[in-house]
């Protein structure tokens, strides 16, 4: 009786708690979202189940506990009947409670509370039913048996059949379950573990290099006692002083003083060379200085130029390197042309001698490029050559030697010209911008004056043909005219400066007969003609001619030079195709173009014209001379 009262009180308490939880949920119905984690937590909180089984005490003996047959025999009919009875009672109790409570709530939190209360009521009904039998009392506590497993599965399956969840919540739970199953099927953790193993396998193990063990009884290699600097007894010898190694100069200076005129391509004792020296001396006796030079008309001049042609007999390689200077012997009997090369050679070619190979003689009076070359106007038997090596030499045919006229080992020379008509004094330009006055009548090979100019570099020097006290210099970007009478060693200012140039100037020359014109060749691809008829503070610019002067580093720079027979025409090489040599008038008109066909296939950077005859010689960067003549 007391047991039934206690059960009734517990039932009443559980109903009150259930009612409080339902009311508590109703107060929170306006919440935007309710988590379902509490439902899962409520279902999983059950850890121990108590089951009352009918048990008979008639066969019980003292000191012995015997399980009923229905529990020992798993296949007995009583066990199956008990399971079916339990399932039926659970379903009935849950259905009855849910029917009365689901009308007032639709939330997942209330459903979890109802699930817990229904399980509690089911347990109480079973206890009351089993306690009503007076001769049966059974207490079973099972946490790990197969019967509890079956009851858990049955309870879970019964909970799955609940229809209290809304369709949205059912769909949400289904999606969560499907997503969890999908990610589990991907086996991401296993893939990550495999990748981690692969990365770890790729790293090679650090292996320490084993040091070779030295053999104790290893015999050393034999060594030279001379290299060890010891004597046979093992005593060290005194250290011998080492001599400094001398670096061979690529272009060593030739010894000072006169040099013998020995041809490098011939035997100096050959009959041909002796005949050549004799011919040179004979033709030099005939002087052309008394011949009057008359300026022909432009029409006549063009007609004479048209008759000048080139052939294979007038093309020959005279020097070993590029040609830097060319000069004609003034003889009208023989055609003798001289060329100064980059290698320091000076070549002489007698075009009247056949075969042409026998008329070429090559000498080595310098060790560096020969940039300026002239035959003496007073004595054509003298050939003067100036080189970068700082020497100015005179080749004398009568004595067959190259005399040293001027020597300066501190500065490189660039150009020179004759200050006096008798060729006794010279004006010499240096690459560092200084100017030297040299007098051949003074013993020795030194200068009379050394003047520092305002130019940083001097490329060419040229003396006025009439007023010989004036000379013009071409520098980096300026062209200056000086008066030789006003030169002082401390420094001299130019009389006039031609500032129209924008880039470096290759050359500047007075016109050959009167000196009334000046022509300059500039790297800005322009030829400029100035009016120098009056040497005053201003020299006006007359004409500018566009002409390509960009030769590059492998070709000698182009220079425009005057034709000695014509006061108003200049000759210059061309970069145009086909290769040619052009003649321009001071007005800018192109007077003539010398085309050679297959005989002229290179650029003739350096050109010269015979002073009295219509003969043109052009030198290229391989040492060849191309001659156009009537």
Swiss-Prot record:
Sequence ranges of Acidic residues compositional bias: 145-155
A Gene Ontology biological process term: DNA damage response
Q: What keywords is this UniProt entry annotated with?
A: Repeat, WD repeat
Q: Give start-end positions of Polar residues composition bias.
A: 105-118
Against SMART domains, the record matches this protein to:
WD40 (SM00320)
Species assigned in the record: Rhinolophus ferrumequinum
Q: What is this protein called?
A: WD repeat-containing protein 76
Alphabetized InterPro entries for the sequence: WD40/YVTN_repeat-like_dom_sf (IPR015943), WD40_repeat_dom_sf (IPR036322), WD40_rpt (IPR001680), WD_repeat_DNA-damage-binding (IPR050853)
Report residue spans for region: Disordered.
105-165, 199-219, 231-252
Gene Ontology CC entries for this record: heterochromatin; nucleus; site of DNA damage
Its function?
A: Specifically binds 5-hydroxymethylcytosine (5hmC), suggesting that it acts as a specific reader of 5hmC.
What SUPFAM superfamilies does this protein map onto?
WD40 repeat-like
Per the UniProt record, one Pfam family is WD40
Q: How does it assemble?
A: Interacts with CUL4A and/or CUL4B.
Lineage runs:
Eukaryota, Metazoa, Chordata, Craniata, Vertebrata
What the record says about family reads: Belongs to the WD repeat DDB2/WDR76 family.
Q: Can you say where the WD repeats lie in this chain? A: 318-359, 365-405, 408-448, 453-492, 500-540, 542-572, 598-630
- Show the PANTHER family listed in the entry: WD REPEAT-CONTAINING PROTEIN 76 (PTHR14773:SF0)
Recorded GO molecular functions are: DNA binding
